[in-house]
Amino acid sequence: AHKAIDLKNWRSNQMNSGFLPHERAWMDALIDQVGWVDAFRVLNRQPEQYSWWSNRGQAWAKNVGWRIDYHLVTPDWREAVSAVSVYKDQRFSDHAPVVIDYDLNRRAP
């Protein structure tokens, strides 16, 4: 998970794989220095938008999850992002598909 908004219990997970400081720094570098864009967050900045839930306890039912599945795009695709969602109508595994729609007519040249 990249930011605290991307997992339910970020404070207690700061030293767990998937939210370690060096992992978050790597994502920061991809986005802030290299210039890649988190396509999901272009349109959805709401909390509790997760793509993975533990199979333990009631994580799915209580939406205690992490957003660890990403669409990273180059900056010229930012304006083309037209819809984003996490498909949760069916449960296929501990991950849910992250769906991004792109409007090719809105892509920057």
Language model: regions and residue ranges:
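Short helix-loop capping/hinge motifs at secondary-structure junctions, enriched
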Residues: 77-80, 107-108
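Short basic/hydrophobic patches in alpha-helices and adjacent helix-turn junctions
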Residues: 70-77
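Short, solvent-exposed helix-loop connector elements
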Residues: 52-56, 81-88
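Surface polyanion/phosphate-binding segment centered on an Asp-His-Pro turn
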Residues: 85-109
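Short capping/connector residues at structural and topological boundaries
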Residues: 57-58, 73, 91
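Metal-dependent phosphoesterases centered on the DNase I-like endonuclease/exonuclease/phosphatase
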Residues: 1-64, 68
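Residues at the C-termini of beta-strands that transition into short coil/loop
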Residues: 40-43, 76, 88
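Active-site beta-strand/loop signature of hydrolases that rely on acidic residues for catalysis
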Residues: 1-4, 39, 72, 94-95, ...
